[in-house]
Swiss-Prot record:
InterPro entries: Kinase-like_dom_sf (IPR011009), NAF/FISL_domain (IPR018451), NAF_dom (IPR004041), Prot_kinase_dom (IPR000719), Protein_kinase_ATP_BS (IPR017441), Ser/Thr_kinase_AS (IPR008271). One of its GO terms (molecular function) is protein serine/threonine kinase activity. This is CBL-interacting protein kinase 23. The gene is CIPK23. Residues 13-268 form the Protein kinase domain. The activation loop within the kinase domain is the target of phosphorylation/activation by upstream protein kinases. The PPI motif mediates the interaction with the ABI (abscisic acid-insensitive) phosphatases. SMART domains: S_TKc. Residues 306-331 form the NAF domain. Induction: By drought stress. Its cofactor is Mn(2+). Belongs to the protein kinase superfamily. CAMK Ser/Thr protein kinase family. SNF1 subfamily. It catalyses: L-seryl-[protein] + ATP = O-phospho-L-seryl-[protein] + ADP + H(+); L-threonyl-[protein] + ATP = O-phospho-L-threonyl-[protein] + ADP + H(+). PANTHER family: CALCIUM/CALMODULIN-DEPENDENT PROTEIN KINASE KINASE-RELATED, NON-SPECIFIC SERINE_THREONINE PROTEIN KINASE.
């Protein structure tokens, strides 16, 4: 969905811009043409899934999401398939990652951290009651909706209780090392519920401290710290918070506090609000149909290209901003609130914008690939989480106003923050800041009106 206009339609959904992408899946903004509802659609390539023997994992993810109906968990609406792709239609969350709050503020106040932690425990406790363990809990997988409610995402590595072996333990090592429980690293079998709670404890520490309890550039040294629970709480933690975190980050899973005990903890109970959620009977029998194993072609959807006015792409972008607040499209970078994706406005022609970004990125150690009105910037040097990669796209708002979005597609979020601040200094002549977002809003509204 670039300056050239046009869009793809799948079933009743009109696909828009890319929100994120990984090895096996791409997530796109979409709109239900029947109801007008905005959603996120995860798109998987069937050939890649088959080639990498990912069928079991994808079925597991879909089964997991269908089982969960909770206000603090991303909801799955439906699943579709074409001859070549699988489409998972999910709730669209527009408030960004909880990680963004930590990255921009350094740390949260204890009461704010407790509120998010309570919502996280509500979600995790409910998932466990449905036989689902997340196994990759970390701030990047915790999203916020427009009202600031926490939503747990990414169940791609979850394990249903039916997969527990005869010893009653899970055996697959998953997750991000800094957040993983010691018994998971040992790979001798572990209780999924206790392992998830350890990760929740690390998240609580990060929310309140602004940094990780276990950190080391050497992986074996990191593991040793995790095995020994070698950490110390900063002085600003309250005494009761310190005691609770030490009970959660107990390296012995048999003596580690349980969620039932945690919910009765005095620190946790302060201001606690029980969740309100709906119950639903869920049928998992239709999961096989998305891979068309029966040979039935009638359930397949058709993907087709439709030409549409390119100016609508801007409204699609705006609709993902909180409350249609156009001010969020023209972020003041001095505030430091750069997210995993960020955007700015420009009055320069689209080709000139891309050329200037390309010229600025080269000296910073990035290889640039150019296609239509998109750039892919690939870092030459390995970072903390692999090579940093940034996807850049230009959208036309009006004939004289463009919006430029830069999105991290691989690598470390903090390294992306540093990259964005550095490249911004070289793009000051490209970036346009309106005197008032209301003026920009009026201009866009006039373009939209017939």
């Amino acid at each position: 969905m670039s300056v050239s206009g046009g869009r793809t339609r799948v079933g009743r959904y009109e696909l828009g811009r890319t929100l994120g992408e990984g090895t096996f899946a791409k997530v796109k903004f979409a709109r239900n043409a029947d109801s007008g509802e905005n959603v996120a659609i995860k798109i998987l390539d069937k050939d890649k899934v088959l080639k990498h023997k990912m069928i079991a994992q994808i079925k597991r993810e879909i089964s997991t999401m269908k089982l969960i109906r909770h206000p603090n968990v991303i909801r799955m609406h439906e699943v579709m398939a074409s001859k070549t792709k699988i489409y998972i239609v999910m709730e669209l969350v527009t408030g960004g990652e909880l990680f963004d709050k930590i990255a921009s503020r350094g740390r949260l106040k204890e009461d704010d951290a407790r509120k998010y932690f309570q919502q996280l425990i509500n979600a995790v406790d409910y998932c466990h009651s449905r036989g689902v363990y997340h196994r990759d809990l970390k701030p990047e997988n915790l999203l916020l909706d427009a009202s600031g409610t926490l939503k747990v995402s990414d169940f791609g590595l979850s394990a249903l209780s039916q997969q527990v072996r005869e010893d009653g333990l899970l055996h697959t090592t998953c997750g991000t090392p800094n957040y993983v429980a010691p018994e998971v690293i040992n790979n001798k079998g572990y209780d999924g519920a206790k392992a998830d709670l350890w990760s929740c404890g690390v998240i609580l520490f990060v929310l309140m401290a602004g940094y990780l309890p276990f950190e080391d550039s050497n992986l074996m040294s990191l593991y040793k710290k995790i095995f020994k629970a070698d950490f110390s709480c900063p002085s600003w933690f309250s005494t009761s918070a310190k005691k609770l975190i030490k009970k959660i980050l107990d390296p012995n899973p048999s003596t580690r506090i349980t969620i039932a005990e945690l919910i009765n903890n005095e620190w946790f109970k302060k201001g606690y609000q029980p969740p309100r959620f709906e119950t639903a009977d869920v049928n998992l029998d239709d999961i096989n149909s998305i891979f068309n194993e029966s040979g039935d072609q009638t359930q397949l959807v058709v993907e087709r290209r439709e030409e549409r006015p390119s100016v609508m792409n801007a409204f699609e972008l705006i609709s993902t901003s909180q409350g249609l607040n156009l001010g969020t499209l023209f972020e003041k970078q001095s505030q430091g609130s750069v997210k995993r994706e960020t955007r700015f406005a420009s009055r320069l022609p689209a080709n000139e914008i891309l050329s200037k970004i390309e010229a600025a990125a080269g000296p910073m150690g990035f290889n640039v690939q150019k296609r239509n009105y998109k750039l892919k910037l690939q870092g030459e040097n390995p970072g903390r989480k692999g090579q940093l990669a940034i996807a850049t796209e230009v959208f036309e708002v009006t004939p004289s106003l463009y919006m430029v979005e830069l999105r991290k597609s691989n690598g470390d979020t903090l390294e992306f923050h540093k990259f964005y601040h550095n490249i911004s200094n070289g793009l000051k002549d490209v970036m346009w800041k309106p005197e008032s977002s209301i003026i920009a809003g009026d201009e866009i509204q006039h373009r939209r009106s017939p």
